[in-house]
């Protein structure tokens, strides 16, 4: 295994389209970072898009056979091997955690795409286009809080002082043990820059359990 990709695939009244592949880093099987567009060869892109489209076409056909529409966002996870071959891992019939980066990278986030699709609005390649300047990369960094109680976010202004950064705090009132409570977003000149900026936002926050 060389690396993993997520291809967000959208089924709507206009058919099936795919977003630019998303790179990701996991810890113990849980998402920690993602970035879009990921770096890959043209052959990997072709394989990834073909596998994602084929998987979703099959699921949509099954849904339609039972009288459903099969519309929405599907997160297709893929393994890229060191020899360049791409293998299917799994598919989530919903917006995907690694796809939170689309809140910074695309014209429409995965959440907006999902809402529009299930409402019957057509989704075309135009709607899934990247909105960041050409040559730049967007990144997300999960903020996982440990403790028992309510999480209070402090030092937010300082954490977001660097241009091209953002923070989305989830509407989760309490944490018991460990829980993903927010996500840091950033746009940078390349993958390393974007990931570092998002990571700096996460590390600069002072999160207290009250």
Report the location of each language-model feature.
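Active-site "cap" helix and flanking loop/linker of ATP-utilizing ligase/carboxylase catalytic domains
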Residues: 47-76, 82, 92-149
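Short, flexible active-site loops
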Residues: 29-39, 90-103
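Broad gene-expression machinery/nucleic-acid interaction feature
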Residues: 4-6, 18, 73-75, 88, ...
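Short, acidic Gly/Pro/Ser/Thr-rich loop/turn segments
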Residues: 14-17, 26-28, 96, 148-149, ...
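A short, glycine/Asx- and small/polar-enriched loop/turn
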Residues: 81-87, 178-180
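Conserved residues at beta->alpha junctions
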Residues: 22, 82, 105, 185-188
């Amino acid at each position: 295994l060389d690396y993993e990709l997520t291809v967000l695939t959208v089924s709507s009244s206009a058919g099936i389209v795919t977003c630019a592949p998303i790179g990701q880093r996991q810890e113990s099987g849980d998402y920690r970072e993602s970035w879009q567009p990921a770096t890959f060869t043209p052959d990997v892109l072709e394989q990834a898009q073909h596998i994602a489209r084929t998987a979703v076409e099959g699921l949509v056909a099954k849904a339609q056979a039972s009288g459903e529409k099969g519309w929405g966002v599907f997160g297709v996870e893929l393994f890229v091997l060191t020899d360049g071959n791409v293998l299917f891992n799994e598919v989530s019939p919903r917006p995907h955690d690694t796809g939170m980066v689309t809140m910074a990278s695309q014209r429409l986030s995965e959440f907006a795409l999902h809402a529009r699709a299930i409402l019957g609005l057509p989704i075309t390649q135009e709607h899934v286009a990247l909105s960041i300047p050409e040559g730049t990369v967007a990144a997300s960094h999960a903020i996982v809080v440990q403790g028992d109680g309510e999480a209070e976010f402090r030092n937010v202004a300082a954490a977001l002082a660097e241009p091209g950064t953002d923070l989305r705090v989830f509407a989760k009132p309490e944490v018991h043990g460990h829980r993903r409570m927010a996500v840091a977003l950033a746009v940078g000149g390349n993958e390393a820059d974007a990931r570092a900026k998002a990571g700096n936002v996460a590390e600069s926050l002072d999160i207290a359990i009250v």
